[in-house]
Amino acid sequence: VELTAEEKAAVLALWDKVKEDEVGGEALGRLLVVYPWTQRFFDSFGDLSTPAAVMGNAKVKAHGKKVLHSFGDGVHHLDNLKGTFAALSELHCDKLHVDPENFRLLGNVLVVVLAKHFGKQFTPELQAAYQKVVAGVANALAHKYH
């Protein structure tokens, strides 16, 4: 990911304030509500029949936290995203057969959730930096598909 030193510092500073459980659950939940076809990868999660059911689902929240923890690993290894996400890329490609477009969608949803949680702190400049990061993570996760 091509970030300036200032962008990297800003991304890391905000990430240190992110509550992975809250933001992760909300981001994954929103992905499943806004893009309902993504629910097919989560058959074992129980009731996903309504937006309220999705957003209140304990398995969605738990997996969202796990996803965000992995994303945080990427934030702390911006110079080696492909290496950081190699195993997850292989898992999602070979075993789970997840459409790599879903990584881009989740990244964009994550930016929305960060904006919601951080309000004015999430400046347009910070959003631009995070868009670069989520694009880089999505690309790294899609790496094994190429």
Swiss-Prot record:
SUPFAM superfamilies for the chain: Globin-like
PTM sites of type N-acetylvaline: V1
Any one cellular-component term (Gene Ontology): hemoglobin complex
Superkingdom of this protein's organism: Eukaryota
Any GO BP: hydrogen peroxide catabolic process
Every Globin domain range: 2-146
Sorted UniProt keywords: Acetylation, Heme, Iron, Metal-binding, Oxygen transport, Phosphoprotein, S-nitrosylation, Transport
Tissue specificity note: Red blood cells.
InterPro entries: Globin (IPR000971), Globin-like_sf (IPR009050), Globin/Proto (IPR012292), Hemoglobin_b (IPR002337), Hemoglobin_oxygen_transport (IPR050056)
Record keyword Phosphoprotein present: yes
Binding site for heme b: H63, H92
Gene Ontology MF annotations: haptoglobin binding; heme binding; hemoglobin alpha binding; metal ion binding; organic acid binding; oxygen binding; oxygen carrier activity; peroxidase activity
CDD domains per UniProt: Hb-beta-like
Residues with PTM S-nitrosocysteine: C93
Modified residues (Phosphoserine): S44
N6-acetyllysine modifications at: K59, K82, K144
PROSITE patterns: GLOBIN
Quaternary context: Heterotetramer of two alpha chains and two beta chains.
Miscellaneous section: The variants found in this sample from a single animal suggest the presence of at least two beta chain loci.
Similarity section: Belongs to the globin family.
Function, as annotated: Involved in oxygen transport from the lung to the various peripheral tissues.
Protein name: Hemoglobin subunit beta
Phylogenetic lineage: Eukaryota, Metazoa, Chordata, Craniata, Vertebrata
